[in-house]
Every structure is written in C-alpha cells, then in structure tokens.
Amino acid sequence: MNAVNTSAQSRFHSVEAATENNAVQEQAIAVFRGPHQPATDIAAKVQALETLLTQAASEFDSIALASSLAAEDNVLFDVIARLKLNIRVFSLNTGRLHQQTLDVAPALQAKYGQTVAWFEPQAAAVETYVNTKGRDAFYESTALRKECCGIRKVEPLARALQGAKAWVTGQRQAQAATRAELPLREFDADRGIEKFNP
C-alpha cells in the first residue's frame, strides 16, 4: 500500500508538525509523488495545481474548498493561502472526528492566518438518529449509513456551499475504484455549481 494512503501519514501527526515550515511542502511531495517520480514531475504538478486554483478563483467570485484536513486538502490550503486566492475554506465537523484531525485547523490558521469555517450537523437530527437507531447504527446497513451521512455530512455540506458558484475538493483518482475516472473539473448537477478535483 502506498504510504500516502496510510492514516498515519495522511494527516498531520500533531499541531507542532502542522506549523513546521516545511510540513505542507513535505505533504505536497507525499501527495504528488508516485513510485519513482523525480522531483521535477512534482514541481510541474504543483505548478499545474497553482494555475488551476488561480484560474478557478478568478473565474468564480464565490468559491470554497471543502477540507477534510487530510494531507491532500492541506496542500490545497497551502496554495490558496500562499497565493492569497479568494477561496474560502471550510470543514465538516461530523461529531465523529478524531482530536488529531480537529487540531489541524487551528494549526493551519496560526501558520497562514486564514480561517477554516466549521459546519456541524443539526444537533436535533443527530440526537434523534442516535436515540432511535444507536450511535454506531451506520455499521448495520447501507440504509442506516446513508441516513447517518445525510445528517452528518450532506446537510452540513449543503449549508457550507450555500451561495457558492464553485467548490474544490481534495478527492483523488487513486483513493478508490469509484474515483478512478474523477475529472479535474465537472459540473455538480446535485448542487448546480462547478466542482474542481485537483
């Protein structure tokens, strides 16, 4: 398995690691480097990413990065912050995130001076789901998993993207077979806005 895909390396190990001068650059190398790729290929990919995000920010006056605070998203955050792009950054706090994940946002804010906006599920909906189906009911069936995701992810995402004309994700083709054909840019018909998957 590729080192990029391991949980330990896909997130910052600590707040201190997130604030080190080269932490994001090291993540960029980990994200963009495939087996035996020379550094020049990485530089070209970073340049292409910078160009894409710059063009997206100039094309859309209301654009947002949906950040999971994983390595891929932190590379995007770094580019947005360094280039001072008008792309707001948000994350979904599902109520089930690990503390290490939660610690990344303030570290990024401290390093770059750019805020990560948090969107959470409606407390009443979560409470009803947990009380009637159980805290971990999403393990029991596909229907319960989809219901939980609807409450904890889909609805908060809809609020986070309200008013946006485009959004950016950290999804990668290598993450899953279902993402193998993930386009760089697509129209998100569910939300009626453009979507970038750099």
Segments the model singles out, each with a brief description of its role:
Residues 2-198:
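Nucleotide-activated chemistry modules centered on ATP-dependent adenylation/adenylyltransferase
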